[in-house]
Amino acid sequence: MKESQSLTNNLLMEVEVLSNRLRNIKQCYKSTENKALKGRLFSENKNLFKRVSEIYKIAELLKKNNPENINFSNLLVEITKRTLNENKFESNLFFL
């Protein structure tokens, strides 16, 4: 396995974990009344969103360096893009 493939696979796994955590945070945020917990959840959500954004930038670079149309880099770009869009769309939950 090439080094970039290994990196891409690791990033795919990380994005999957981050995406699940972001969903769990939103669910917790909606169901709790504790202001301190809501503050921590909001902060963690922001940090995770930043990390997914960083991974998206890396994925774009990997995609540029790989001439193939169908590959893991393209999959990584698509998954991170969907995670970012899902988080942007649902970010309104924090301002209810």
How should each PLM-predicted stretch be described?
Residues 9, 35-50, 70-77:
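Short, charged, amphipathic alpha-helical segments
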Residues 46-67, 85-93:
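Amphipathic alpha-helical coiled-coil segments
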Residues 18-20, 37, 48, 60, ...:
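Intrinsically disordered, low-complexity regions enriched in serine, threonine, proline
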Residues 1-19:
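Short, charge/polar-rich alpha-helical segments
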Residues 70-96:
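Amphipathic alpha-helical binding modules
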Residues 12, 16-17, 27, 46, ...:
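Intrinsic disorder/low-complexity segments in short proteins, especially the signal peptide
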Residues 11, 18-26, 32, 48, ...:
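Non-transmembrane amphipathic alpha-helical segments
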